[in-house]
From Swiss-Prot:
Pfam families: 14-3-3. One of its GO terms (biological process) is protein export from nucleus. This is 14-3-3 protein sigma. GO terms for cellular component: cytoplasm; cytosol; extracellular exosome; extracellular space; nucleus. It comes from Homo sapiens. It comes from the Eukaryota. The keyword tRNA-binding does not apply. The gene is SFN.
């Protein structure tokens, strides 16, 4: 199928909310070997974020049921729950591996500017983070190191090449701070990164273009929400919700 046709079908699949189809079309477009435009890389991100989002939610529900049945000593239900959770886990790992393969084989190498490179390195960190959520033992440690490395490389580039209010830079800092808090067990680092990012963006808010204003201020609000939650948790209070990250 022609590249233009794949992109068009991905847009149709998005409108129909058929995200697995959308992901398959965008995978085909990436494998054609041309650099993606800004619109196209967003299509890729939305497609896989929706596919993996459903799997992450299902895995969390099943893990919770499995834990409860283990605590109750339910020999009847336990093996079935574990088997189904493992099935979902395998599917989730497959999607993450596909995305990471596209990033390493095509997207990061073909990125022609700093913004694209940061976008794809952030994506790499995100998909290693999703793998870390379901990993155990030595595997988990290796995956966490890979996520941290991708996020850090993206942070280094974004600080040199992008203003503090750039929505991609803000989204990266938001997700890296969630990684510190949820995956790496480093609440102080999470709070420090979120606070510094928010403060620097606030100081630079007057430079924002009308196009970026909505995206940037939305991510800044998510940073502030997470900061409120995390500082309350650190003070020994119960957090009311999971840390937030952008939807695309």
């Amino acid at each position: 199928m022609e590249r233009a046709s794949l992109i068009q079908k991905a847009k149709l699949a998005e409108q129909a909310e058929r995200y697995e189809d959308m992901a398959a079309f965008m995978k085909g477009a990436v494998e054609k070997g041309e650099e993606l435009s800004c619109e196209e890389r967003n299509l890729l991100s939305v497609a896989y974020k929706n596919v993996v989002g459903g799997q992450r939610a299902a895995w969390r529900v099943l893990s919770s049921i499995e834990q409860k049945s283990n605590e109750e000593g339910s020999e009847e239900k336990g093996p079935e729950v574990r088997e189904y959770r493992e099935k979902v886990e395998t599917e989730l790992q497959g999607v993450c591996d596909t995305v990471l393969g596209l990033l390493d084989s095509h997207l990061i190498k073909e990125a022609g500017d700093a913004e694209s490179r940061v976008f794809y390195l952030k994506m790499k960190g995100d998909y290693y983070r999703y793998l870390a959520e379901v990993a155990t033992g030595d595997d988990k440690k290796r995956i966490i190191d890979s996520a941290r490395s991708a996020y850090q490389e993206a942070m280094d580039i974004s600080k040199k090449e992008m203003p503090p209010t750039n929505p991609i830079r803000l989204g990266l800092a938001l997700n890296f701070s969630v990684f510190h808090y949820e995956i790496a067990n480093s609440p102080e680092e999470a709070i420090s990164l979120a606070k510094t990012t928010f403060d620097e963006a606030m100081a630079d808010l007057h430079t924002l273009s009308e196009d970026s204003y909505k995206d940037s201020t939305l991510i800044m609000q998510l940073l502030r929400d997470n900061l409120t939650l995390w500082t309350a948790d650190n003070a020994g209070e119960e957090g009311g919700e999971a840390p937030q990250e952008p939807q695309s």
